[in-house]
Amino acid sequence: MRPRTTISAAAAAVAVVVAAGTAAADPLDEFGFGAAAAATAGARTATATGPEAAHHNPAGVALGIHPAVLVGWGYGAMRLSINGRDARVLDAHGTTMGLAVPVALGGGWTLGTGIALYLPDQFLARLQLIPNNEPHFALLDNDPHRAVVEPVTAVAYGDKLALGVGASVLANARSKKIVFDVGVVAGEKVGEAELDVELPVRLAPLIGLWARPHPRVRAGLTYRGQLALDIALDILANVQIAGVVTGDVLVSLRASNYFTPARFGGGVAIDVLPELTLEADLTINRWSAYPAAADLAVLIALDIAPPLVSTSLPVPAFTDTVDGKLGVEYRRPGRRTDVAVRAGGAWRPTPVPPQIGLTSWADGDRLLLTAGVGVTLADWAPILTRPIDLDLALQWQHVARQLTQKHIETVPGEAFSSGGNILHAGVSATVRF
């Protein structure tokens, strides 16, 4: 048997075949939590209260008057293309659920607890392996397709000041043992497998601060820590085919998926009129911490060993970005039913650098326009003892078209174009009790 040969994790011939493309952010960042927030482009740092605050600003879960439950559903049509053809990015659809329970402590103080949940319809998580040199939307392939869990707690003093903390919860995937035995015995194919994988929990901190410095002005600050699903898999294949090949192969994979950058955000809301509110948010995203491409190591101990060329993949070199969001809400109270009309817009610059090397990650600056309407069943006693909100939101995201050209004198590869649109519709209901 030949001595074991170590093939670098960055071996180009291997990386091109099975390297994992990481994804970014999460569904609630992409489409908002609740239809009211989605209709204002997610500009809710200063105005979110009750269940929707569990995601947009944890401090707001202590600002509600009554316990409340939010339930919603949304569908996002991913109309993206590469080289003028469908990029085959899966549509995103799932259920949002939120809870906020404020408890009066006396002396003007209120303690609140809450949670934000998102459950995709198709699966709890989607991990996809795409060759790094194959053009694909690295930030949109997976990120709308994972569960989100964000428990929070907050304390508020009247309607003047509130502070909230919590965590965004995810899990890693780490193998303790993955072994496959394959071979041929007496002319019959045989095989068996042993699998032992653990999913240790990871937490990213959530912090929110809210204040009302003026009766018509509200302001908020938020911080969320970096989060990712880290994959550490070691797969051992024992091969026994007498007279043909015997030995074993160890494949070791290290990768990150669902990368969500650390972010710091601030927002302000001004009640221009008692029935008209303008909202603005600004968010700094630390994309420069985006992890490197998948780290793959292969140890071969077979009677045959194909030669491979060792090389290195470049670091992603993502850049930090600043997102801006604007929202407006007009409320018209009625005798028994209140109506709210909302609109918003956002600008999300891409963190992906020019793809002139081995990798071919498609992306583009994004323009987001939103609109929606809400109805509050405010005074329907004795049928309803508490108000119920019913909201609808429509979103259009335009991913700017880009033409990417390679430096073919140093790195082989073809030019490609990318771009498209994302259309999203969502509904939600908030019930107080």
Located regions from the model:
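Bacterial N-terminal signal peptides that target proteins for export
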Residues: 1-11
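N-terminal signal peptide c-region/cleavage motif recognized by signal peptidases
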Residues: 19-22
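Outer-membrane beta-barrel porins/channels
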Residues: 26-38, 94-433
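Transmembrane beta-strand segments of Gram-negative outer membrane beta-barrel proteins
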Residues: 27-44, 62-77
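Residue-level detector of alpha-helical secondary structure
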Residues: 39, 53-60, 70, 98, ...
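Surface-exposed strand-loop-strand hairpins of Gram-negative outer-membrane beta-barrel proteins
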Residues: 42-47, 77-92, 410, 414
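Outer-membrane beta-barrel pore proteins
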Residues: 45-47, 54-67, 101-107
